[in-house]
Amino acid sequence: MKNYLVLLVTLVFALAGCKSDKKTETDTPLKELNILEKVAEAHGYDNWKNVSSLKFTFNVDRDSSHFERTWLWQPKSNEVVFMTREDTITYNRKAVDSLSAKTDGGFVNDKFWLLAPYQLVWDQKGFTYEHSENQEAPISKEKMHKLTIVYANEGGYTPGDAYDYYFGNDYVIKEWVFRKANQEEPSMVTSWEDYKTLQGLDIATMHKMPEANFQLYFTNVEVK
């Protein structure tokens, strides 16, 4: 009888422990995403962790002129290969020196255009931001969300610059404004168009300026 009571008490405590664990698991709240993370996630940011290499060609057409350069980036090792018709340069972003700084500046610029939604997460400690709703987008004139980020005045290749992102309730960017040194007037306004999904990454491959013979776009985008 004594052994039976001991077994019964042990079983009761075991069941209570299981019930308590289940309650803890159920009651654990999910982390609420901030606006930066919501925009990044809307563009497939959750799949970035699976990317081992990214190759793309950055193109600019202005009037009759054309400019392009190609990059191959291995984000886990941070090795970058820069390719043009004239030259090929390989360097590592963990060890940028005076010789590779200019090349790295070009890479940072081109990568920012390609992966700006992800930069909201990667760079969030380096800028301040403000989010508002029902703001008129500069190109379409539609009412959208507006997210303004202003980079710190120190560090990076373009300190103090500001960007205004415009998007709908799906958090997918439709337009943006670049304001150099956080000046009030826009330095550049472009659309975000021709989204393509590559290995779960949703990337805008075309940016056009209204009423201007200018387009910035990406070709040969490969994600592995």
Q: Which residues are covered by each model-predicted region?
A:
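Sec-dependent signal peptide recognition
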Residues: K2-L8
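Flexible, processing/modification-adjacent segments and terminal tails
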Residues: Y91-D161, Q183
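C-terminal motif of bacterial Sec signal peptides marking the signal peptidase cleavage site
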Residues: A14-G17
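Bacterial signal peptide processing site
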Residues: K19-D21
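N-terminal mature ectodomain segment of secretory-pathway/periplasmic proteins
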Residues: D27, E32-A101, G126-F127, H131-E136
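Gly/Pro-enriched, hydrophobic low-complexity segments
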Residues: K143-K224
